[in-house]
């Protein structure tokens, strides 16, 4: 079993790939940002951790009211940005109760279309990431599809072919003995503070720090290709387990 596992992965248990196969990695690993080296240490790559706050939970009908992005390069957070966004509709009380953003807060804010190009520029060339990535990816994709930015050269975060790194998947794997996977509690267990939970830039910063901290665990692959491949496997296994538990 060990030999079969190594052969499928193309790497040693440390995540370092066999010599001479770097040119083959992209052919067998889906989900990579094509501009970035598959055999690079993922922690050294530019990573954009994205967090959105919204009017609800359905990306098809609800809208973004705040977006925060934290950028890491070489394993260090080098930039944080935040935008309040006017959703063009009232923010329901149940949504405001979570993120504390009200209609008054966004009445003079620009619509998403007005900041889309700026956001796309910041995300250019970066590995996209988010905590519970399916949520943020769905909302960001829905918003960008409504704008003229959708027709320009897409940043990796806007490409359907690119996998987002998801610290939640890794928290579920590496903190299996813990009941809560809420960002604040996962962060606290790693000694990372989150003072303003559910505000986009604070959540983005904390989630990126969580991913970098989890990445120091020896069970996390070192290279970008191996990380994406293993995250896919873990996400599928975790989804299967949740479905099984639902029917027990």
How should these model regions be labeled?
Residues 127-144, 173-247:
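Acidic, Mg2+-coordinating catalytic module of metal-dependent nucleases/exonucleases
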Residues 2-161, 176-181, 185-198:
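Conserved non-catalytic scaffold segment of RNase H-like nuclease domains
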